[in-house]
Amino acid sequence: MASPEDLKSVIDKIHDSRIRYYRNENNCGAVNVVDNWNICLSYAQGDYVICMGDDDMLMPNCLEEYVKLFEKYPNLGVYHAWTELIDEFSNMFELQAPRQEWESVYSLIWNRWNGRLNQFIGDFCFDTKVLRQDGGFYKLPLAWGSDDISAVRAALKGGVANTQKVCFRYRVNSNTISNTGNNEIKIEAILQERTWYQELIAKVLDKPHNENDEFFFHCIKLSMPQYYAKKIRNTLADDIYQKPFHIFKWLLQTNRLGISKLQIVYCALLAFKKGVILKVR
């Protein structure tokens, strides 16, 4: 990493051969944060790799639960840890919805688009070889959607196995890219993500292997336009709230965005509503 903080002095106090500390010559920055993920991947020496934030936490049972899955479901490209969300003070305030112990890539996509509101790069454990064969973590600006696509690509190799016990803690704070970040860049990332899924659906997922996956595939195709329209609307609303005059810019880009002028006006109303609620609070 290339943190402005004096982390080396902290690391120098720790004498443990299992800990390896690297410092980038240049900071990758928020827009290109996936470059840093892939730099970290290049240093990985084990069979499996977890890319977690420095303020996230592996719970004491995390690796044990993963090993159980490795033994029961060998040769998968990705595994997932049931995760609780914590605040800046390490207080748990939300729990991910439970998942079945194994699911196909079709189920992973469908459930992510329909109810699994929270999912992060750190709660996935990847087979290092598979991840490298895929070209590393999938790069999108601000990593906006990179975690989902990286997991989906790995899950194409046999699905994903999920721990049945909570074993990972993801920290939410006001300074994360999710809560800051440039909304215009986020829109660009969403458009790139949408294009990637369109190609996946057309060229890769079009031959499901059983009735369940046929059902999921049908639902994925039907729900995709609405899913991305909503994702774009929410981001536009945040952008218009911060920069009201941007509404005119977005009104000129309806074809590229894939939403109507009326929907952009609706985004402006959402932005206005958000402003009113914040003022009341």
Placement of each model-derived feature along the sequence:
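Catalytic metal- and UDP-sugar-binding loop of GT-A-like glycosyltransferases, i.e.
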Residues: N24, M52-D54
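Membrane-interface aromatic/basic loop that binds lipid-linked glycans or pyrophosphate carriers
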Residues: L222-R281
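Acidic donor-binding segment of Leloir-type glycosyltransferases
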Residues: M1-N26
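The conserved acidic donor/metal-binding loop of glycosyltransferases
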Residues: M1, D54-M57, W82
